[in-house]
């Protein structure tokens, strides 16, 4: 998964700040805008830098004329195959590119895993013991992991934070087991919840986003999912957290300090006008680099 792809190539994350527009490159990208006058965000790779001034002017016009404007259609000059830019406060799409076409969501899937786990009502201090039979398949598949070991006892909170900050497949597999008994049952739960949210072109097969041809979504559906996730106070706190230390146990006497992957990747790309709040990255060979994120502007921003 994405944590094993640390180098940034031409299709990796690249950022440009021109005037008031934040431009971020990824293979599939969605940013949720949370204030009326917030600058628009969009996928962009370094190869498109020469065209950004024209694009910027068009996007700013789209963001300041909600009554007359229609979503800006991003062209093939933007390397990202899928994009969806949404002003949540006004419930208005600012720009999109193939926003309703199917794509592989990779670890953005873990937003749904987080939401269902937080909605389960399970106590944060509920213990969970890892076993080798669960961890070995994840290692074989090359899934990103927090680093939990066989026979290690952790808490439900550790699993929640580990699933997002470290994008840990070990944490998400454990969450699926705790919430629904096994991952297959949890995937059915994920699909039912997706229908409830109006994610009608999404189908989940697993809790982590490991590639499967039948595991797909759209940029629009991921936007809906992120909005709903942010309405949950616990989910929002986790998605906005920079650093977390897991509980102490016999395997890790001092706990493990885990840091937000998405924040580490975004730390060099912070515009003055917009405050990046958090989100979820993703990567598989089939999906490419992915990002679902949210930002706010102003000291008293609108939105959830």
List each model region and its residues.
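Hydrophobic single-pass membrane-insertion segments
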Residues: 27-41
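Hydrophobic alpha-helical segments, especially transmembrane helices
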Residues: 9-11, 21, 35, 111, ...
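Phosphate-binding loop of NTP-binding sites
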Residues: 4, 48-50, 55-56
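Active-site-adjacent loops and short helices of periplasmic peptidoglycan-processing enzymes
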Residues: 9, 37-44, 55-220, 227-233
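N-terminal Lys/Arg-rich, disordered targeting/topogenic segments
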Residues: 1-11
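Penicillin-recognizing serine hydrolase domain
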Residues: 13, 41, 70-71, 76-80, ...
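Hydrophobic membrane-insertion alpha-helices, especially the h-region
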Residues: 15-27
């Amino acid at each position: 998964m994405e944590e094993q792809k640390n180098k940034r190539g031409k299709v990796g994350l690249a950022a440009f700040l021109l005037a008031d527009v934040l431009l971020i490159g990824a293979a599939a990208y969605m940013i949720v805008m949370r204030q009326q006058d917030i600058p628009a965000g969009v996928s962009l790779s370094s190869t498109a830098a020469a065209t950004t001034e024209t694009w910027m002017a068009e996007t700013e016009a789209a963001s300041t004329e909600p009554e007359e404007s229609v979503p800006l259609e991003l062209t093939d000059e933007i390397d990202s195959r899928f994009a969806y830019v949404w002003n949540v406060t006004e419930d208005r799409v600012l720009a999109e590119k193939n926003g309703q076409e199917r794509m592989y969501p990779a670890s953005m899937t873990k937003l749904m895993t987080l939401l269902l786990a937080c909605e389960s009502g399970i106590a944060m201090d509920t213990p969970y013991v890892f076993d080798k039979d669960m961890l070995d398949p994840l290692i074989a598949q090359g899934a990103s992991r927090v680093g939990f070991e066989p026979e290690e006892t952790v808490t439900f909170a550790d699993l929640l934070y580990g699933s997002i900050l470290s994008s840990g497949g070990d944490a998400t597999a454990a969450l699926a087991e705790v919430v629904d008994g096994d991952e297959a049952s949890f995937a059915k739960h994920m699909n039912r919840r997706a229908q409830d949210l109006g994610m009608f072109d999404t189908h989940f097969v697993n809790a982590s986003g490991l590639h499967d041809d039948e595991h797909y979504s759209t940029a629009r559906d991921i936007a809906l999912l992120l909005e709903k996730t942010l309405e949950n106070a616990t989910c929002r706190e986790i998605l906005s957290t920079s650093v977390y230390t897991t509980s102490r146990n016999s395997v890790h006497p001092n706990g493990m300090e885990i840091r937000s992957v998405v924040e580490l990747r975004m730390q060099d790309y912070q515009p003055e006008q917009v405050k990046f709040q958090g989100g979820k990255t993703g990567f598989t060979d089939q999906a490419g680099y992915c990002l679902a994120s949210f930002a706010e502007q102003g000291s008293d921003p609108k939105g959830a």
